[in-house]
From Swiss-Prot:
Gene name, Swiss-Prot/TrEMBL: rlmG
Protein name: Ribosomal RNA large subunit methyltransferase G
Family note: Belongs to the methyltransferase superfamily. RlmG family.
Catalytic reactions of this protein: guanosine(1835) in 23S rRNA + S-adenosyl-L-methionine = N(2)-methylguanosine(1835) in 23S rRNA + S-adenosyl-L-homocysteine + H(+)
Location(s), subcellular: Cytoplasm
UniProt source species: Aeromonas salmonicida (strain A449)
Length: 377
């Protein structure tokens, strides 16, 4: 496992989060290195706030630590990673400011550094927010995998900020340089996206970075068709996304209490919006938590846990998140408590559940998905 980022301009020890002893993935990529090298060779001259957006595990925050950056992220895990890696490198975590991707940005930043993901909706929302605060003196530089930077990506920078150009590729990464223009007319914000949930009369609200933003994903649809109701008073919707599973439970069972948990600030905000707009009378029975799986959730906090596990972290394919979700569920559930999961058939969740719970029952399956139930003995 490579943990030392050693360049001509910095030497940092960096870990992914949560730290794993045999993690084959490193906590930075070529885009981070490209940004660090470029920023080091052209020092910041303008006074004003420094904003970092979408810093995966804190490499950019550590490098720009002397400038007390404002670190903007939709990911709770990225925030925890940033703080852990600052401490690892003996850098004061209080010198930076963490804020979620829906919070207001500081005015007139001197520098904006953006890690570009392959999800353009998040980028569009962030550029729209930047449009309201940048000035012609603001330096805007972004980076990402070359394969994720398209003409449509550059068009977003042009639309919301100003003239844009790209760099040559380096280690399969590419830079974007943008020159913000003077204050321009306000543009309509297309987020959150709103669409009807078929057969319910409900309207689903999705912020920009929520999975399956414009329609119900097929895994969630399959779980909705087989949703367990009654017999559980306290339910956790783990990895809740827009909260559609917990929302359906609140609608069907007037006694159930649902806790919506996700590591995405936008997901939890979307879940809250959906309860507020569709079932306002159920709000006293709903709780909302941004968290890394079930960290610090008390034993017995739920009788049943529903889970549609992700199999990626940022842009890396990994099964450790699903494994942590299952392990945390086993810890939190009381004897007789149930974990219900939906997943792609090829992901072998059946054997993972058997290792933890010593049982796993197929509730329903189709050509692509399987719903499994495991009971805490």
């Amino acid at each position: 496992m490579q943990t030392l980022l050693d360049t001509a301009h910095c030497r940092l020890t960096l870990y992914r989060y949560p730290r794993q002893s045999q993690d084959p993935l490193q906590a930075w990529d070529a885009a981070d290195e490209y940004l660090i090298n470029t920023l080091a060779e052209t020092p910041l001259e303008q006074a004003g706030p420094v904003i970092i957006m979408n810093d995966g595990f804190g490499a950019l925050a550590a490098f720009l630590h002397p400038h007390a950056p404002v670190c903007v992220s939709d990911s709770y895990i990225s925030e925890r990673a940033t703080l852990a890696n600052l401490a690892e490198n003996e850098l004061d975590p209080h010198a930076i400011r963490l804020q979620d991707a829906l919070a207001p940005l500081p005015l007139a930043p001197a520098l904006v550094v953006i890690k570009v993901s392959k999800y353009q909706a998040l980028l569009e929302q962030q550029l729209l927010a930047l449009r309201a605060v940048v000035t012609p003196a603001t330096r805007v530089i972004a980076a990402g995998k070359a394969k994720d930077i398209h003409s449509s990506t550059l068009a977003l920078f042009e639309k919301y900020l100003g003239p844009t150009r790209t760099s040559l590729a380096w280690k399969k990464a590419r830079l974007i340089h943008c020159e913000p223009q003077a204050m321009q007319p306000e543009l309509a914000n297309p987020y959150p996206t709103v669409w009807p949930l078929e057969g319910t009369g409900m309207l689903i609200h999705n912020h920009a970075n929520v999975f399956s933003r414009t329609s119900l994903d097929i895994g969630a649809r399959f779980m909705l068709d087989n949703l367990p109701v009654h017999s559980a008073r306290k339910v956790i919707d783990l990895g809740c996304g827009n909260g559609v599973l917990g929302l359906a439970l609140l609608a069907k069972d007037p006694e159930v209490e649902v806790t919506f948990i996700d590591e995405s600030h936008m997901a939890v905000a979307s879940a809250r919006l959906n309860v507020e707009h569709n079932l306002p009378d159920a709000l006293p029975r709903a709780r909302f938590m941004v968290n890394n799986c079930l960290d610090d959730v008390a034993v017995g906090a739920a009788d049943r846990i529903l889970c549609n596990p992700p199999f990626h972290q940022l842009q890396a394919i990994t099964d450790h998140i699903a494994w942590q979700m299952f392990s945390d569920a086993h810890r939190v559930l009381p004897q007789g408590g149930e974990l219900w999961i939906v997943g792609n058939r090829h992901l072998d969740y059946h054997n993972k559940l058997k290792r933890l719970f010593a049982n796993a029952q197929v509730v329903a399956s189709n050509s692509k998905f399987v719903i499994l139930k495991a009971i805490k003995r």
